[in-house]
Regions:
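Short, flexible/disordered intra-domain loops and linkers
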Residues: 36-46, 92-97, 190-194, 258-260
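Catalytic core and acceptor-binding pocket of nucleotide-sugar-dependent glycosyltransferases
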Residues: 171, 175-272
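A short, glycine-/small-residue-rich helix N-cap motif at loop->alpha-helix starts
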Residues: 86-90, 95-102, 198
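GT-A fold catalytic core of metal-dependent nucleotide-sugar glycosyltransferases
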Residues: 73, 81, 85, 99-161, ...
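Extracellular/periplasmic catalytic domains that process cell-envelope and extracellular macromolecules
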Residues: 22-23, 159-161, 237-241
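Short, solvent-exposed loop/turn segments at secondary-structure junctions
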Residues: 34-37, 71-74, 84-88, 130-132, ...
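N-terminal anchoring/stem segment of glycosyltransferases
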Residues: 3-92, 114, 171, 271
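Short, hydrophobic beta-strand segments that form beta-sheet elements in well-ordered domains
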Residues: 61-70, 124-126, 130, 148-150, ...
């Protein structure tokens, strides 16, 4: 029996494309959005989207944007469900004040692993009520090898405190900030030592000034309330030349019309 040579061809639609796995982003920017009953300021998906737009505008290296939230509706960047741990914990300095103890779990290596953040990768946590004014690469490079960097200031009763509005850490390197926290005892220990606030009180108490930090004068990380409020400025229409990030860690927020009218530079940067 004679057989003819038969040539088979694979139709284009049946061809298999092999995709190479994408490398992890070297840094993950994290923001937080959840509803806290009784707190004065509601945070929205728009605030998250503006935050993400500012990061994209002022950080051009590879990165990942992540919002940890109890309500992802309307958020354009990647989201992750907020855990229930410490969801009923209140700020020991006052129930009307923000309570951010829930954020401490981000220091757990189990959580960063679940977030697909590799051990040693950088995580930069930011509050939503900030305005990024220029390139922030310097802030990240300055302490690139450190396990933890915070927004550093001088406390009323202690020489060094860290504000929870901004902090950067390497995943898996500061597990103790979560592992050693006990809500029944830790907040009272921090307050007894005159470190106030919720998560920032614990961070300041536990670190005791041993970690480096960004400052207003050296790094341009400023407080709108303390450094830039119109009443304190010769010209409310201009930013200091060294301003990189303005934190609205107080009652005034950058999306409020009155605040924008008093400081018109806000809308130049706080936008989609």
């Amino acid at each position: 029996v004679e057989t003819a040579d038969i040539q088979f061809s694979v139709p284009r639609s049946d061809r298999v494309t092999i995709y190479k796995p994408q490398p992890r982003a070297p840094i993950t920017f994290v923001c937080w959005k959840w509803h806290q009953p009784g707190y004065r300021t509601p945070y929205t998906a728009e605030h998250v989207n503006v935050w993400a737009a500012m990061i994209k505008r002022y950080y051009k290296k590879p990165h990942r944007l992540l919002c940890i939230t109890d309500n992802p509706t309307g958020i354009d960047c990647e989201t992750f469900p907020l855990w229930k741990d410490l969801d009923t914990a209140r700020n020991p300095s006052g129930a009307h004040l923000p309570s951010c103890y829930r954020r401490l779990k981000i220091f757990s290596p189990l959580v960063t692993s679940e977030l697909d953040i590799g051990e040693g990768d950088e995580v930069f946590s930011m509050d939503l009520d900030i305005v990024i004014c220029t390139n922030i690469e310097m802030l990240i490079q300055k302490y690139a090898d450190e396990s933890f960097v915070g927004w550093k200031g001088v406390g009323t009763h202690n020489p060094v405190v860290y504000n929870g509005s901004l902090f950067k850490f390497r995943a898996g390197h500061v597990n103790f900030l979560w592992d050693e926290f006990n809500f029944k005892t830790s907040p009272h220990e921090a307050i007894k030592a005159k470190y106030f606030g919720s998560d920032q009180g614990w961070l300041s108490y536990r670190l005791r000034g041993t970690a480096p930090g960004w400052t207003a004068g050296t790094d341009g990380v400023l407080s709108y309330t303390s450094n830039l409020h119109a009443a304190r400025m010769r010209s409310r229409a201009h930013l200091p030349s060294n301003a990189r990030i303005i934190c609205f860690n107080g009652k005034r927020k950058p999306w409020e019309k009155e605040v924008q009218q008093n400081s018109p530079w806000i809308t130049t940067h706080w936008r989609l």
